[in-house]
Amino acid sequence: MVKLKSIVIENIKNVQYGVIDFQNKSDFINVTGIYGQNGSGKTAVVDVFEVLAALMRGGSIPPHKKGIFNAIDQVGENNITLELEVPGRYNIWYKVKLAASEPTGSQDIIVIKEEIGYRPLESGARYRYLMRYEYEGSNFDSVKPQHTGTLKSQRSIMGKDAISVLTKTITDDNRSFLFSKELHSFITASEKQELSTLIEIYGVMEEFCQNLRIFNQELSSMTGGEVTPVTINYHNRESHLSFQGIIPMSLQNGGFSIPEELYPVYDGTITYLNEIVPMIIPDLTLEMETGETEIHSDGEKFKKVNFISNRAGKRFSLKHESEGIRKIISMLGFLVEVYNKENIIAIIDELDAGVFEYLLGELIEIFSESAKGQLIFTSHNLRVLEKLPSYKVVFSTTYEIVV
């Protein structure tokens, strides 16, 4: 099991410096509410976790996150420091520094420095770095850019030529060097016993990414439209079909065509939601009406479905359900997971948007008392604030730091 211990953000969007500790004394905090006025940096926390998740999975920085980084010649480096803990064993940190061009939609971004380290949870133990990478190439405006870098670790992993080639590749792709699949191939192929700790730490960070659930502003804004994104964690023991993530519930007139092989996922999701929704919203159940089967030109079969809201026998299209209820339905998969599983970390932006404040307050109170995982959310609603003890609340501010 891995827990989120802290996050430090510097020069991302309008955040000059921000730190959040997800631990109170020796206990991990199961619910953290982030509050602050508009423009104080609440959503930057969600953005940063999206960037971290992409980098640590070996992927590129998401295109929709380009533009959140400050140009390096204006305010300094964009820094993120993530700290995790494997209870009873060790703390792990990952530090990344990013350089960026002017903050436009086509913003160029380079990972210029990364570091992975750990500290055993033993008396007197110190942090030990495992691997460091530093970019030593050209600036963004170079006519003939040169991409070079250095890699330092406790044992040699790659030669200089291989490092240079990989540096160019990850720079072009806006990826992490330390979490690149190419570097992992070198590490696993080396078969050096001295790298066993590094491989173990990589495994922990991979587990963190697998357990991370993010419900961002883009998903939240969709709940008021014709497509409601639904968070799910579907497992079918008979067919061995598994699906974790987000599926779309299209509410367009005339129904929604879904591939026949995905029909059990939707059907199972409706059944699963109906085990929980009535406990939160009395007399409400969801239905999925199945229409005719369509065969497309390529031979693939689709089923036409319609999603129905049933309120104590009164049936109408889910499209005309309130935005707040659709928002709860949309988030429910992640909320149930973080409530029941101690290894899940769910991050939800604007949790309160469109949701009736009394219902929201009751939900947060239940989670604060009994959730096993870690729920982190941003909110404007003071009703939620009343339901949380002070150590579970983080305030963002627009005041500048004066050094």
Please provide the spans of the model-predicted regions:
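Conserved P-loop NTP-binding catalytic core
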Residues: V46-T104
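Short beta-strand micro-motifs enriched in acidic
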Residues: K95-I109, G291-H296, Y399
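Hydrophobic, Leu/Ile/Phe/Ala-enriched alpha-helical segments that form helix-helix packing faces
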Residues: A53-M56, L84, T269-T285, F367
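Long, charged, glycine-rich C-terminal linkers/tails
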Residues: P63-I68, L284-F302
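Switch/communication elements of ASCE P-loop NTPase nucleotide-binding domains
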Residues: M1-H64, T269, G299-V403
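Electropositive, glycine-dotted interaction segments
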Residues: S101-I281
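A structural detector for beta-sheet-dominated domains
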Residues: E10, D21-Q23, E83-P87, A99, ...
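Broad, structure-driven detector of short, well-ordered beta-strand segments within folded domains
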Residues: Y90-E102, A125-Y133, L286-T290
